[in-house]
Amino acid sequence: MAYSIANNPLLRKNFAKIKKIIDIPNLIDIQKNSYKRFLQLDVPAEARKYSGLEAVFKSVFPIKDFSETASLEYVSYSLGIPKYDVEECHQRGMTFAAPMKVKVRLVVWDVNKEPSTRSIRDIKEQEVYFGEIPLMTENGTFIINGTERVIVSQLHRSPGVFYDHDKGKTHSSGKVLYSARVIPYRGSWLDFEFDHKDILYVRIDRRRKMPATVLLKALGYSTDELLNFFYKSEEINFAGEKLTKVADPELLTNQKAAIDIVDSATGEVLVKANRKFTKAAIRKMAEHGIKFIPITIEELVGKISSHDIVDPSTGEIVAECNEELTQAKLEEIKSKGINTFKVLFIDNLHVTSSFRDTIIIDKIGSTDDALIEIYRRLRPGDPPTLKSALSLFENLFFNPERYDLSAVGRLKLNYKLGLQVPLDCMTLTREDVLEVVRYLIDLKNGRGNIDDIDHLGNRRVRAVGELLENQYRIGLVRMERAIKERMSLQEVENLMPHDLINSKPVSAVVKEFFGSSQLSQFMDQTNPLSEVTHKRRLSALGPGGLTRERAGFEVRDVHPTHYGRVCPIETPEGPNIGLIASLSTYARINEHGFVETPYRLVQEGKVTNEVRFFSALEEEGHAIAQANAEVDKDGRFVADYISARKSGEFVLVGRDELELMDVAPMQLVSVAASLIPFLENDDANRALMGSNMQRQAVPLLRADSPLVGTGMERVVARDSGVSVVARHNGVVESVDASRIVVKIDEDEYDETGTGVDIYNLIKFARSNQNTCINQRPVVKIGDHVKRGDVIADGPSTDMGELALGQNVLVAFMPWGGYNFEDSILISERLVKDDRYTSIHIEEFECVARDTKLGKEEITADIPNLGEETLKDLDESGIIRIGAEVRPGDILIGKITPKGETQLSPEEKLLRAIFGEKAGDVRDTSLRVPPGVEGTVIGAKIFSRKGADKDARTELIEQAEEKKLRKDEQDEIRIIRESAVSKLKKLLVGKTAAVKVEGKDGKILIVKGKAISEEALSSIPIDRWDEISVADDESTDDKVAQILSTLNQQIDIIKYVFDDKVQKLKRGDDLPPGVIKMVKVYIAIKRKLQVGDKMAGRHGNKGVVSRILPEEDMPYLEDGRPVEIVLNPLGVPSRMNVGQILETHLGWAAKGIGWQIEEMLEKNSEKTKIKTYLKEVYGNKEMNKFLDTLDDEELSNVAKRLKRGVPMASPVFEGSSEEGIREMLGKAGFAHTAQVTLYDGKSGDAFKHKVTVGVMYVLKLHHLVDDKIHARSIGPYSLVTQQPLGGKAQFGGQRLGEMEVWAMEAYGAAYALQEFLTVKSDDVAGRTRMYEAIVKGKHTLEPGLPESFNVLIKELQSLGLDVELLENEED
């Protein structure tokens, strides 16, 4: 069967009603794009943007010495080729990294005699090795010391300005106190806050507070500048005895008129006394031409002057700026003949006097005093000078080296405060500070909004690239100090750049980050889904983030802006709930680190197919329709009013007001949650468990894709990177279990390409979680594959679809109490058919070291062991592949020299006579630990460079080399064949210009005759250059070109493979003191057994309680026994009804499969099968596909479908109940999906009908074999002498206080005494007991438990004199 037919995505019947607008973005692009932006490898050095690694270098360099006579400048960086490839790094325990070289320039200056001029004396440019930088693999992971790790993206508070209030909790009066905080990317924090007296204070770096005006004065502003910036002024006029003020419409709103406002021309009263100036009244006044409003002198008393009021005749200041005007002062102003002056507009309703009050309590006058005051607060104890104060203040907020808002911070500041500062200005400006304070004062006065710190516009994502950029910056700053010191200590003119640069501090920081940072995690490799989810995880924890203990409820909660960006379902249970989240399906991260989600644009009530990505801030204020809002075929909304989201609320809006629409219903949830069919029918808590448990599903021996899926299975399998995907279009040349060779189509590759793809498959490799990674080909020889097709399945994938569990026939009914409380009753059939058998691979390592007493040796010659024990070891002391081992068996034989003991003269004599005996070595072989039983599937040996190789190493090397040579020969063969076919096309039928003879003198090509295909086939290809065509130079040129390209390609292939073989034979880099290292891999087959944990996809989990013989299971009318019996009581209270709908739809899918099987068995006509399939699918595209199939292809499709027709019920747009009923009808089942079951033991029918169907059930990684544990004797704790605890320590079972009570209640005194003494920490007693058992006696002589001695010592250490008095018996 043509591969493309078997693998056609159309075979999964899809219930989706909404057309797909855009494809789901690659699921691991978040990792790959971030690292790509960080390295900018595909950009030439001179064209690189100021971001990532380039930005770090440019921000730290140039480095100048203290006297500024030399500077070290950065030019560019480049990366070399990694020493080992990914596979080798895995095997050798190395880091997959590339060497980095940085080109730097050392410029030395001559300082001239003229002040502040200098000339260049010398410039030296050099490329300096700068350590290694880890590279990301194709799948978005890093390989550090041989293990795959993932850098989790961090969700942290975005830099910018944030306004908040204390909710009235700070002061006892319950007054709401507002505050503002400016958070930079790096640098000092700036806080402004009001106290309960409405005075505005500022804190720098959370130090002691001071009046905010101190900071503003330090910025160079005077008191009157500040007052006039924060307050508006009113102009007051004396007109004889009358007092008037200028009618400013902006200030008049909501003020009251002191006296009637009358139009002097008509005498009409426009505003009555004590009435407010409304907008209508102000407009009326303007129409009547009233420019001045009469006021009373009482209104003016208590107002504040906004400028100095000066006597025009003498120049004397009558009232200073910020002075309160009293009755007397006003009289004085009037008497001096000052007719106009200005006062601050403060009405204590909409404008309060808080800022003016702050100026009053601030006793500092000048900018210099303000600078010194700030210096005193930040550096208490240091004597302040104006110069040091100024330099400290400049460095705080205005020096790009010390303070960085980042582009994001600047963007947020501009957005919040309405500024137009360019984005490349990344320090604070004076205007920024003023505007921050202005907004805070407005906020207090009731204008503006406080910020919600959980809004995704105020939180951003730091992905791998940015996290690593910060580490590099830390490392470079450390290196900068060292370089400056070196420049000052040595003569710079004699130095080269490499003498100054030591990259060790940088490498150390990066190494530490990858090795031990909280965000660098051991990849969860249980199955493909867990890998993908791990790479898409967002964590609020980690350096610079939150801590579990301090995180409150708000941070963890779901926020309206999470919609389409962060999954509201998938998060861990336990202390990290809500702090670790997962990116939604369609979400992506923009250049500023904000999470964006796609929307379709709506224009005039019509939805378009144009898609744009919006961040949470950009989305604010838009009306967004749901993806399932009803539209007609032209894209117009059907309803007049549509439910939409706007600014975090659900509202009904008219269709013309809609601006955006969701692209898909599943855009809300993450990848794991989108794999749960009928998610919309599950309770959210159970859905959370379901999405978490899918990540723990163990890859099974036989992958089986779900009958009821969601359509996401193919996407996850494709993007996870576990399956092998075709790189080019081509035809499969050869296939075996471990490699696939594809000959590329001619139009696919250029002249330089080899024209052949060889895919070496991964066979039985060990994952991080000890599960088995194995790839199996799904193509056959002759299949034509297209670029992007899956050609080999990986773990947990089936025909390119994710397959985490098995489709099993389940019945919901109680059965003999074996499914009480979530227990699961399973049929022995599942065990017999290996449906839930999984392979786990354990790695054991043995190291031979060079010790002080001599070298350890790996050998089969071990003293005091019988032949039976050593039967499976080869002569090198390593176990053979295929050996079945049990706990205690030797895997690698190793002997270690013993310390020399003093020998007696007699022993020395005997030793001199009989030679050295084997007494000076001890057996330190690697043995199989308890609980491990399996088959040896591999061994790897690493020897020091230059050391002699043992037989086993040579054997392994030969096998590897043979594999490489086979690849080499296949590549050469295929490109030769393609060259030959091209040449034949050119030459056959053309007239030969020269004759060509064979080695025996026989003429193969006759001059002047047409060249035949047989003649060409008889000539070896290396002699084809002798062939020439008459009167056709262009053909000759083409032939020569093809032959020369062929030879070049063959040379390249040989060179590449020779290099690989060389690498293979080279010794290994081992840690100091290690002579040889051997790793042995054991495959353990785990069948399903009682105690294993299983789960569905809806959070329905349970433990296998009994495995029942097939014949005892309840069976259907046709005699088929069910495979699993679940408890119906597990559904109602948990509210995960999705599992029942899945069971019904699975039952229909299975039933349709049985119908097809019946048709095939009866050899029904193909048209009948085709009609039935068309009926089932009811899909135009599928009908078209079925019509293109011939009988054989149709029968192959039918065979594939007889196990059940796979269905996709996508999240939030899945099959309706009617849809399920329709499918049940087509399968020939009752609409209730309930059947009569019969008891397997008695054969009687059960009283009630039972819900039966097919459910997808997973086996989780919590296997009973890993948990069961027993101990007789083992290690003891040093202090208490009690057995250690836990399986890993081979510990004992704790017998605590409550258990002692139980024993006491039963009066089991002797048993209890035994428990508390010889079985625990009575050292002497347990030794006596051991000896007694060896001698065959069974006496119990308990002594004093060691814990009693510990207690006495503790009391003595507290200074209490406790003595133990022994009763001497007479």
Swiss-Prot record:
It catalyses: RNA(n) + a ribonucleoside 5'-triphosphate = RNA(n+1) + diphosphate. SUPFAM superfamilies: beta and beta-prime subunits of DNA dependent RNA-polymerase. CDD domains: RNA_pol_B_RPB2. InterPro entries: DNA-dir_RNA_pol_bsu_ext_1_sf, DNA-dir_RNA_pol_bsu_external_1, DNA-dir_RNA_pol_su2, DNA-dir_RNAP_su2_dom, DNA-dir_RNAP_su2_hyb_sf, RNA_pol_bsu_bac, RNA_pol_bsu_CS, RNA_pol_bsu_protrusion. PROSITE patterns: RNA_POL_BETA. GO terms for molecular function: DNA binding; DNA-directed RNA polymerase activity; ribonucleoside binding. GO terms for biological process: DNA-templated transcription. The keyword Transferase applies. Pfam families: RNA_pol_Rpb2_1, RNA_pol_Rpb2_2, RNA_pol_Rpb2_3, RNA_pol_Rpb2_45, RNA_pol_Rpb2_6, RNA_pol_Rpb2_7. GO terms for cellular component: DNA-directed RNA polymerase complex. Transmembrane segments: none annotated. The keyword Transmembrane helix does not apply. Its EC number is 2.7.7.6. It is an enzyme of class 2 (transferase). Keywords: DNA-directed RNA polymerase, Nucleotidyltransferase, Transcription, Transferase. HAMAP family: RNApol_bact_RpoB. DNA-dependent RNA polymerase catalyzes the transcription of DNA into RNA using the four ribonucleoside triphosphates as substrates. The RNAP catalytic core consists of 2 alpha, 1 beta, 1 beta' and 1 omega subunit. When a sigma factor is associated with the core the holoenzyme is formed, which can initiate transcription. Belongs to the RNA polymerase beta chain family. This is DNA-directed RNA polymerase subunit beta. It comes from Geotalea daltonii (strain DSM 22248 / JCM 15807 / FRC-32). The gene is rpoB.
